[in-house]
């Protein structure tokens, strides 16, 4: 298996001066070890392209533990909020081409995170499905999110104009993160945020979004909540 070969691969990679590849193998090995101990609605996903290497370990039924490293400090902070306020156990390691710009890293993390949730959720039976008007305030900012976990993909997002960057996070990627995540996982989401401070607007939106997602994914005793028989 992977763990049996990983040390050999790392040694060969370092010998050939492929430090990034050796690091990627180390990350994947640690994630594989961690995934063995998770038995709830969980998944381990990796995604590798010429632009990024993303590794995500997710436990939906967690307690909000996290280990996040994307190379973008503010993005890390938002993903930590995502894990904590959604009560998801979440490990993310991203190695991206940040020497070019931030776009590929943020987009690919969103896509891989959507894949991780999709794998962990499975057929979507026995979940609440809906979360309506999950509202959160942060000083002058208020954000409200509603979700339907039926597999009809749509995002309607209303948010004030932001300054170009919050920390090292380009705000043109703010909505794009949610688009990429929602398109990959497949559900309907309405986001409405009002405020003045760009930091507050982004953070309040991430928090209300993850709280809504957590409620929509909460387990119940019902079968699939649809007369169609599928979501």
Region spans (language model):
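Structural preference for solvent-exposed beta-strand-turn elements
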Residues: 18-21, 27-231
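Acidic, Mg2+-coordinating phosphoryl-transfer loop and its flanking beta/alpha structural elements
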Residues: 1-12
């Amino acid at each position: 298996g992977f763990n049996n070969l990983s040390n050999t691969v790392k040694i060969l990679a370092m010998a050939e001066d492929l430090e990034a590849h050796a690091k990627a193998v180390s990350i994947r090995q640690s994630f594989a070890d961690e995934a063995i101990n998770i038995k709830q609605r969980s998944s381990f996903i990796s995604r590798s392209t010429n632009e990024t290497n993303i590794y995500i370990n997710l436990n939906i039924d967690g307690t909000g533990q996290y280990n996040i490293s994307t190379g973008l400090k503010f993005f890390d902070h938002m993903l930590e909020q995502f894990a904590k306020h959604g009560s998801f156990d979440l490990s993310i390691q991203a190695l991206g081409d940040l020497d070019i710009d931030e776009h590929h890293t943020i987009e690919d993390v969103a896509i891989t995170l959507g894949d991780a949730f999709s794998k962990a959720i499975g057929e979507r039976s026995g979940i609440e499905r809906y979360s309506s008007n999950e509202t959160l305030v942060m000083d002058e900012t208020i954000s409200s999110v509603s979700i339907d976990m039926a597999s009809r993909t749509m995002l309607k997002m209303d948010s004030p104009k932001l300054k170009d960057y919050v920390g090292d996070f380009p705000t043109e990627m703010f909505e794009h993160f949610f688009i990429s995540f929602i398109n990959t996982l497949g559900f309907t989401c309405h986001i409405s945020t009002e405020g003045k401070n760009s930091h507050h607007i982004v953070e309040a939106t991430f928090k209300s979004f993850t709280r809504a997602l957590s409620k929509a994914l909460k387990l119940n005793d019902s079968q699939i909540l649809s007369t169609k028989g599928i979501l």
